[in-house]
Design a protein with these regions (language model features):
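ATP-dependent helicase/translocase motor core
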Residues: 1-235, 244-254
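Conserved H-loop
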Residues: 241
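Conserved SAM-binding loop
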Residues: 238
């Protein structure tokens, strides 16, 4: 259910978020829009409006999955603990190709992120909470901050393809179920060298390549979270080449 101008009153503060997306009566997504024709409007103003809602009508965000902000030109999504710089665009509607710059970012986000299948998948498998400790050097007081993190579009599509490929390689998917599936397409269609067909049960899941700073550790967490459900709680072995990566990955998984 999508509601326009949904009114929320809390502590005598009536507020009307532009769009609220409900799933089974639960407000999971809040969308704040600004008018592209207004020269004073910006996507940052939409973010600030969300911050105002969080302060004045916090109960609206009790079960919130994520929020979307847009000024009509740009459109980005983030969690309720994300700073403005952590809000990210959803750049593909199908995970195959990046959307054309001629297509509205909001349209791409709605088609790629807010369709029923992707939305529920994001809620269930691609949102995590990370706790960080910070000690005051003067008082010695330790504060623990909890940050809610959500997969970016490249992590979402990469992890789901990795899961599909792993299930195929392990023989968990029957050949007839692969008919028309993207895991059976040739890597050559992406300009990569590869075989024409990936047989079921060949024990070759493949390689996921990420650039530096693109969230490799979280992608591993998302992948592990999905694969343990699909494959009857398998053992996952993580191999690193540096001690600092051991600590980093341990903290991320923990």
């Amino acid at each position: 259910l999508v509601v326009n101008q949904f009114t929320v009153v809390e502590n005598n503060h009536p507020k009307r978020p532009d769009i609220v997306l409900f799933v089974n009566g639960i407000p999971l997504v809040v969308i704040e829009l600004k008018n592209a024709a207004d020269e004073n409007a910006s996507i940052r103003m939409a973010f600030k409006q969300i911050e105002t809602y969080k302060a004045l009508i916090p109960t609206l965000f009790t079960y919130n999955g994520f929020v979307v902000i847009s000024d009509g030109l740009e459109a980005k999504a983030g969690t309720i603990s994300s700073g403005f710089s952590r809000f990210m665009a959803w750049k593909s509607s199908d995970g195959q190709v990046e959307a054309s710059h001629l297509v509205s970012q909001l349209e791409t986000l709605i088609e790629g992120m807010l369709n029923k299948e992707t939305l529920i998948d994001l809620m269930r498998h691609f949102i995590v909470f990370e706790k960080t400790k910070k000690e005051d050097p003067e008082t010695g007081i330790i504060t623990i901050n909890t940050v809610k993190k959500m997969a970016a579009y490249h992590q979402y599509y990469a992890v789901n393809r990795a899961v599909e490929s792993t299930l195929r390689a392990a023989g968990y998917i029957l050949p007839e179920l692969l008919e028309g599936s993207y895991v059976n397409e040739s890597p050559e269609s992406y300009g990569l060298a590869g075989v024409k067909k990936q047989p079921v049960g060949d024990r070759k899941g493949g390689v996921v390549w990420h650039t530096q700073g693109s969230g490799k550790s979280l992608s591993m967490v998302f992948f592990t979270g999905k694969i343990v459900l699909e494959m009857d709680n398998p053992t996952v072995v993580v191999i690193t080449d540096r001690n600092d990566l051991d600590d980093q990955l341990f903290d991320t998984f923990a």
